[in-house]
Amino acid sequence: MTSRLRLPDRLLAIDRALADAGFEHAFGGAIALAYWTLDPRGTSDIDVNVFIPAARCEEALAALPEDIAWSEADVAAIKRDGQVRVWWEEIPVDLFFDYVELHADAARNRRTVPFEGVEIPILGPIELATFKAMFDRTRDWADIEAMLEAETLDAQAVRENLLALIGEGDRRVQRLDETVARA
């Protein structure tokens, strides 16, 4: 079935499906970033954190809109890695499940924001920036810098999260310090 829904409509369908099934969740990535930089950028994917243990991922996968394709290999990847990319036609949907304590913080600190005439949950700025630092991609560091420039980010809280996750010696901690110094 080809739905040709716009990306915002797909995001709202995922939000409704997870909420109707009783799963706490929050959108991350560029969607959340738009609220923390006050400067939206384009995106072609949907990032969603589902606040249940990775071991229970099949329950959440079954609740997603039926056009989102997933397999037993995806279930195995989630149980192993805590995350997976699945597809809704040509749109990637990145799913993240609880596998470290930071996810509990993300659930507690999520915010509700207006989106397309309704309210959706998004990651708070500290958790979003921490996840971005962990991914360690060039664009993620640019996003963190933009959050710092918008003055929506507590850089020390992000640093403390990184120290708890990866330790002082990891280069991502140093890169955060350098990014903060530049901003």
Task: Briefly describe each language-model feature range.
Residues 1-183:
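Compositionally biased terminal segments of proteins
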